[in-house]
Amino acid sequence: MRLENFEIAKSINFIFCSHPLNKKNVDENYLEEYQAAGLNHTCALFSFEDLENGKLSLYGEDIKGVTIYRGWMMPPHMYENFYNLLLEKGIQLINSPKEYAKYHLLPGWYSDFEGLTPFSVWNESRDIGDALELTEGLEGAFVVKDYVKSRKHEWYDACFIKDISDREETFRVINNFLNRQGENLEGGVVLRKFESLKSIG
């Protein structure tokens, strides 16, 4: 890297989630990344929990200018509020709210990666009947999720559909998914073709 490019890169800040019980420390899940970024960049902290309530609480080093966020996923409306609150303090996140929403929600980014990502269909509904309509004409194994998350930790109960033409099993898995996501369901239902990947490591 040329020296001038290195200096420009060094001017970029980072902002991380703070620990929920000790807001002056970084969330332990991001400790190694925080320490690595701190070698060449100014790093601030903020309380994710306070932001969920609409309040911006900053800790750590003072930052201004272009900043990269590293932390937990946020719903687009929460990210937009975060972006605007930081901007009022002279801190500009590198991704605008529009860019964040586009690549956070599957319908926004899918066309950019079609052919490189598993085939997917989706709707904007929370209704089991509407979800079952998505299965028409589909064959093989699929994964059910919303626009952001699946319930992969409940693989056989609320995520993986071995044969989507099996109406009873498909209903069971999708219905479990909808009921368990509840109010946390983001957008609507997504069905993604299951790809059996090679295991490494």
Residue ranges of predicted features:
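ATP-binding N-terminal substructure of ATP-dependent carboxylate-amine bond-forming enzymes
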Residues: 1-92
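Active-site nucleotide/adenylate-binding loops and adjacent lid/helix of ATP-dependent enzymes
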Residues: 2, 11-18, 84-200
